[in-house]
Amino acid sequence: MQTAASSVVGLSAVLPAAVKGRSLQIQAPRRVALRVRAAAAAVAVEAAEVDYSSNISVFPMEACDLIGGEACNVQMYPEAKLSSSAAVAVSRAAAEEVDRDYLSYDEPTTVFPEEACDDLGGEFCKAT
């Protein structure tokens, strides 16, 4: 197989030599055509995009269980669940009222004084 491959490229491993007074003749390399089955030459190409629209979970631990191989080469942690006391604290924080000052935007030329001073300078800085 190696000599066939080298002749396809056009390289010859052995050059003819002069034998018993004959002159040295260099022959042109022979080209041998090899037929390769298309199925054997095909290379598997992975898609550059991943479709996440399936009903199957893509969590690493489950992927490792289902697929194995490279899917198991990630750092995995056990599933974390919030305790009931943490869930109550989160809901309390969300319900907490915050006192805010709102500006009225009903005028056609509402301007923030600090931003006007920073952007425009001059007479706009006197208003602050």
From Swiss-Prot:
A Gene Ontology annotation in the biological process aspect, one of them, is: cellular response to light stimulus
User: PTM comment for this protein?
Assistant: May form interchain disulfide bonds with LFNR1 and LFNR2.
Residue numbers spanned by region 2 X 15 AA approximate repeats: 58-125
Which InterPro entries does the protein's record reference? Answer: Lir1 (IPR009856)
Where would you say this protein principally sits, based on its record?
Answer: plastid
Q: What membrane topology does the annotation report for this chain?
A: Peripheral membrane protein
List the effects observed when the gene is inactivated: Retarded growth. Reduced photosynthetic electron transfer. Marked decrease in the accumulation of LFNR1 and LFNR2-containing thylakoid protein complexes.
Q: Where are the sequence repeats?
A: 58-72, 111-125
Q: Which UniProt keywords apply?
A: Chloroplast, Disulfide bond, Membrane, Plastid, Repeat, Thylakoid, Transit peptide
Q: What induces it?
A: Expression is controlled by light and by a circadian clock. Transcripts accumulate progressively during the day and fade out during the night, however, mRNA stability is enhanced during the night. Low levels during the day, accumulates during the night (at protein level). Rapidly degraded upon illumination (at protein level); this degradation coincides with the release of the LFNR from the thylakoid membrane.
A single GO CC term, please? chloroplast thylakoid membrane
Record's subcellular location:
Plastid, Chloroplast thylakoid membrane; Plastid, Chloroplast envelope; Plastid, Chloroplast stroma
Job of this protein: Thylakoid-determinant subunit of high molecular weight LFNRs-containing protein complexes.
Subunit and partners: Component of high molecular weight thylakoid LFNRs-containing protein complexes containing LIR1, LFNR1, LFNR2, TIC62 and TROL proteins. Interacts directly with LFNR1 and LFNR2; LIR1 increases the affinity of LFNR1 and LFNR2 for TIC62 and subsequent thylakoid relocalization.
This chain belongs to the protein called Light-regulated protein, chloroplastic
This chain's source organism reads Oryza sativa subsp. japonica
